[in-house]
């Protein structure tokens, strides 16, 4: 896990700076903002971890020679990018408008990362063209997700739901005069984002199923069972496939193929590759834990039967 541990001190500084900035927001947005930031604070054990958002600039050190100050700024900007887009997601996923009070806060987050980028990239920099492209990619991906089976018909769109994360990788390459690497690094980042979404969707499938949100695991299961897109998938059906028929095994094999594709790009981003490997291992470990639990239950049932028969 060196992809994280090697950057703990830098991350502590970045999140401390983010706290300082948010503390300066007008009341009550300062308190609301600090509470929201704490939810995703990479320093806190109980927080929701979104490692790629704030670690990607540090992983870029594997192929760039940027000054630490520039890397820290890209990480800080991506923290605010993360917070801004998570609020967008909260609002879009909310049926009753319960997150609308976060809209003013989102605009302050937006102001912060835009201010950082303006410090780093002049108006004529190609960065701004990429910046706009990533917004367009995100907008299209989240708008059409419910009507399309991205995971099977346009898998790149799965990654594009997090396209603004790429501000960090593209920004780092432009600052280091390595624009020629943008296509291959973008492909590597997107491959990682796809597998990360697979892992998230395994964790969130019940909630997504209840809310009617698109979910890669459920979509994969639907295809595996040859169900039509309008067929109902019940929680019981998913549980049976996961815990009885080892569907997570098949899901894990897809993640393994993704890792092979990532390695095939032949980009020397060792930390991000190791991070991706940990994602794959998490899925495979989950599959093995299900099998072991089932085996223990079966043995327990036999022991119970024998004890009753003796």
Question: Which residues make up each language-model segment?
Answer:
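Conserved N-terminal diphosphate/IPP-binding helix and adjacent helical/loop segment
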Residues: 1-81, 87, 123-135, 144, ...
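Alpha-helix boundary/N-cap detector
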Residues: 2, 6-9, 13, 104, ...
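All-alpha helical catalytic cores of prenyl diphosphate-utilizing isoprenoid enzymes
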Residues: 19-32, 45-52, 107, 111-210, ...
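Short, charged, low-complexity loops and linkers
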Residues: 32-41, 65-67, 92-94, 146-152, ...
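A ubiquitous short alpha-helical element
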Residues: 39-45, 73, 97-102, 151-157, ...
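Short, surface-exposed loop/turn segments at secondary-structure junctions
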Residues: 68-71, 94-100, 179-182
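Acidic, Mg2+-coordinating active-site segments of isoprenoid diphosphate-utilizing enzymes
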Residues: 86-101, 105-112, 174-176, 190-250
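Primarily interfacial, aromatic-capped hydrophobic alpha-helices that serve as membrane anchors
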Residues: 118-136, 224-273
């Amino acid at each position: 896990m060196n992809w994280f541990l090697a950057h703990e001190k830098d991350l502590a500084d970045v999140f401390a700076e983010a706290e300082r900035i948010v503390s300066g927001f007008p009341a009550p947005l300062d308190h609301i903002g600090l509470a929201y930031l704490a939810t995703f604070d990479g320093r806190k054990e109980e927080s929701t971890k979104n490692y790629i958002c704030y670690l990607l600039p540090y992983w870029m050190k594997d192929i760039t020679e940027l000054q630490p100050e520039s890397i820290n700024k890209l990480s800080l900007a991506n923290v605010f990018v993360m917070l801004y887009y998570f609020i967008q997601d909260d609002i879009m996923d909310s049926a009753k408008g319960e997150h609308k009070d976060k809209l003013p806060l989102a605009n302050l987050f937006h102001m912060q990362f835009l201010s950082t980028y303006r410090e780093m990239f002049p108006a004529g920099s190609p960065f701004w063209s990429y910046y706009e492209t990533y917004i367009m990619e995100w907008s299209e991906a989240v708008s059409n997700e419910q009507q399309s089976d991205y995971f099977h018909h346009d898998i790149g769109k799965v990654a594009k739901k997090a396209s603004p994360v790429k501000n960090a990788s593209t920004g780092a390459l432009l600052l280091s005069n390595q624009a020629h690497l943008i296509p291959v690094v973008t492909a590597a980042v997107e491959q990682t984002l796809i597998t990360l979404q697979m892992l998230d969707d395994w964790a969130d499938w019940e909630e997504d199923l209840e809310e009617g949100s698109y979910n890669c695991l459920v979509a994969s299961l639907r295809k595996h069972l040859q169900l039509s897109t309008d067929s109902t998938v019940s929680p019981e059906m998913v549980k049976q496939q996961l815990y009885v028929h080892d569907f997570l095994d098949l899901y894990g094999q897809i993640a393994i193929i993704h890792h092979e594709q990532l390695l095939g790009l032949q980009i020397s981003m060792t930390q991000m590759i190791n991070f991706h490997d940990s994602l794959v291992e998490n899925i495979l470990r989950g599959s093995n834990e299900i099998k072991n639990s089932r085996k223990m239950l079966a043995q327990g049932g036999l022991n119970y039967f024998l004890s009753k028969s003796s």
